[in-house]
Amino acid sequence: MGFLKSLFGVTDDNAADEKKQSTDKDFEILKNDGIRALRQCQCNADYAVKCFEHALAIKDDAEVREQLAVALYQLGEYAQSAEQYGKLVELEPDNAALIMRKAEMAYLADEYDVVTADCARILELQPDNSRACLLYARGYMGNGNDIPAIAMLTKAIALDADNLDAYLLRGQQLLKLGDINGAKEDAEKLVAEAPDSEEAQLLLARVNEALGNHEEASNKYNKVGDLNPFSVEAFRERGAVKLAMGDKEGAEADMRQVLEIAPDTLDGTTGDFTAEGREGIQCKVEQAYKNINPLGL
C-alpha cells in the first residue's frame, strides 16, 4: 500500500499537510466570520459565539478566546465571559489588564469573592491602580462589607483625586452608615466637579434631607428632575420631603408622577386615582410614603 502511495505521489506526510491546511483554513474562516459578526452588530453575538467556540475546538488561540469573552459579555453571559478571561489569565498571570476584565465580568455575575481576590492581585502588580481600588470596593459592597469598602474607596481617591465614581460610592456608603457630614463633603465635591451629574445631585439632596434641610433638599430634587424628568427616585423622595413640610398636594402630585413613570413602583397601588375621592388619594399617598424610607437609613 505504501508503495502504491509512493508511486502515485501520495505520502502520509502529504495527506497530513493537506489535512492541516484544511483545518487551518476552517479555523481562519470561523475566526474571521465571528469577528465580522461582532463588528457588524451586537445582535450577531450569538452567531459569533458559535464561530469562536468551533474555532477553539480546532485550535486554542488567545485572540479568539478574548473575542469569545467579548461576545459572551454582549449576550449578558457574564460568568462565562469571566471564565474565558480566566483562561487567558492562566496564560498571562501578570497581565493586570486581563485580570481587571475578568474581575469586571465577575462583578457583573455577582461573584464578589472573585472580584476582591482579582483586585487584590491587581494591586500586587500595580499598587497605584485607582480603578482596581474602586472595583475592589464594589466587591466588598456586594458582600455587605461596608467598612472595608469605604477604606478602599478612600484609597482610590488618594491615588486619583479625579476618581469621581469613588467619591460617589463613598458618599453613598457614608450616608448609609449615618456619617452625614462625611457624605456631605463628598456630595459637595461631586456637585462642584460635575454639576450636571444626576447621581451627584441626588446624593446631595438626600444628605440635605438627612440633615433636616427640607427646603434645600427639595431644591436639589428639583435639579435632579431637571436633569432627568423620568427619575422615579427624585419624584418619590421629593414627595416625601413635601409631605414632611405639610404640602400634601405637592406630595400627591409627585406620587402621581411616580405612578405615571413606573406604575408598579408601589405595592398595592395603581396609577389610576380617578375612582377615588380626594381624601382617599391623600390617604393613599400618606400611607405610601410611610412605607418608603428614601434615605435607606
Question: Where are the model-predicted features located?
Answer:
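Structural signature of tandem alpha-helical TPR/SEL1-like repeats
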Residues: 41-50, 75-87, 109-121, 142-155, ...
